[in-house]
Design a protein with these regions (language model features):
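Non-catalytic accessory regions of SAM-dependent methyltransferases
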Residues: 1-58, 66
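Non-catalytic substrate-recognition/targeting regions of SAM-dependent transferases
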Residues: 47-48, 52-55, 71, 76-145, ...
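Short beta-strand/turn micro-motifs composed of small residues
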Residues: 65, 98, 164
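Conserved class I S-adenosyl-L-methionine
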Residues: 156-166
Length: 166
């Protein structure tokens, strides 16, 4: 699939918040998410706001800005953080990553709400340690949940080489 992002239009915050509300409601109704505390809340590439993803890791919200042209909208990240803080009572931190930033700290993430990100997640009875600020990505991919479940069910007790590291 090829994504064409040549022209980025400014989106009105109310339109984005409406998209976030719809996606949050759908995620909360998804029974497969009851067995995990790490999942994607919003995938802008597919849900109407290319260049923005929002993930939930235990009690931390991770906002990832993939396209620097989205950074021109002042206050947008604050609006996003406020929306989720109001709608997810268990949330105690919001981390913002700007993938294209020249500043390493922004690529690895800055806290815009709370003091520190979560350091572990649980999924299908397995606990995973994580450091959300170690790299420019999260180092744990919620979208591969079904693959991890399959590996757990089919390769229990086997030695597995992790070829997903870089």
């Amino acid at each position: 699939m090829r994504l064409h992002l040549e022209r980025i239009e400014e989106i009105k915050p109310e339109k984005l918040l409406n998209l976030l509300e719809i996606c949050l409601r759908l995620r909360m109704e998804d029974p497969s998410l009851k067995l995990t505390d790490a999942f994607r809340l919003f995938d802008g590439f597919y849900e109407g706001f290319p260049g923005l993803t929002i993930d939930f890791y235990a009690q931390t919200l991770l906002i990832t800005e993939h396209d620097p042209r989205r950074a021109t909208q002042p206050g947008l990240h604050d609006d996003i953080a406020r929306f989720y803080v109001e709608n997810l009572p268990e949330l105690n931190g919001v981390l913002l990553k700007r993938r294209a930033s020249k500043a390493a700290g922004e690529r690895k993430g800055i806290m815009i709400f709370g003091e520190r990100p979560s350091t572990s997640v649980a999924e299908n009875g397995v606990n995973y340690a994580l450091d959300l600020q170690l790299n420019q990505d999260a180092s744990f991919y919620p979208d591969t949940r079904n693959l991890r479940l399959w590996l757990h069910q089919n390769l229990s007790g086997a030695s597995v080489l992790n070829c997903f590291a870089y």
